[in-house]
Amino acid sequence: MNWRSERIWIELITGSRKTSNFCWAFILFLGSLGFLLVGTSSYLGRNLISLFPSQQIIFFPQGIVMSFYGIAGLFISSYLWCTISWNVGSGYDRFDRKEGIVCIFRWGFPGKNRRIFLRFFMKDIQSIRIEVKEGLYPRRVLYMEIRGQGAIPLTRTDENLTPREIEQKAAELAYFLRVPIEVF
């Protein structure tokens, strides 16, 4: 969701609460739980899951390996669920022409630097830069070049924008900020 007026442009950034992250976390949780149950079934010699008879899977080495994969999968799944619940990467970009200030806010991982807040003057913005890498995995990222601070990404690297969409977004932002566009 974006909000735009003559003097203020606010762009909300979705973080890790995407449908694909929910799907991957859920699939990984169920799969790793299945692996762990099969490994435990082979150790106990009982059927904890009725789909796989435990007599067919020997505990050493198959049961140990399946238990290890199950535990590793549960750790990765819990990491994904934590990033989803903390909504890591979400935030907003606020461009205020009236005040002449740009604010970029993102949520990070819990700790001392959970809130990432960048604030600088519009006069320090040198340009809006589009970085394009074509190939098997094309990547198009929009950056804001700041004097003395380098380039700050405005779009996520996994956001697959078409060339037309990234050009339009860059043109609108450059027009709003009254800065040039660079393409790399």
UniProtKB/Swiss-Prot annotation:
Keywords (A to Z) from UniProt: Chloroplast, Membrane, Photosynthesis, Plastid, Thylakoid, Transmembrane, Transmembrane helix
InterPro entries: PSI_Ycf4_assembly
Superkingdom, natural source: Eukaryota
Pfam families: Ycf4
Bilayer-crossing regions: 22-42, 57-77
Any one of the GO CC terms: chloroplast thylakoid membrane
Entry's localization field: Plastid, Chloroplast thylakoid membrane
An individual GO BP term: photosynthesis
Membrane topology: Multi-pass membrane protein
Function: Seems to be required for the assembly of the photosystem I complex.
HAMAP family: Ycf4
UniProt cross-references to NCBIfam families, sorted A to Z: PRK02542.1
Family the UniProt entry places it in: Belongs to the Ycf4 family.
Protein name: Photosystem I assembly protein Ycf4
Source organism per UniProt: Platanus occidentalis
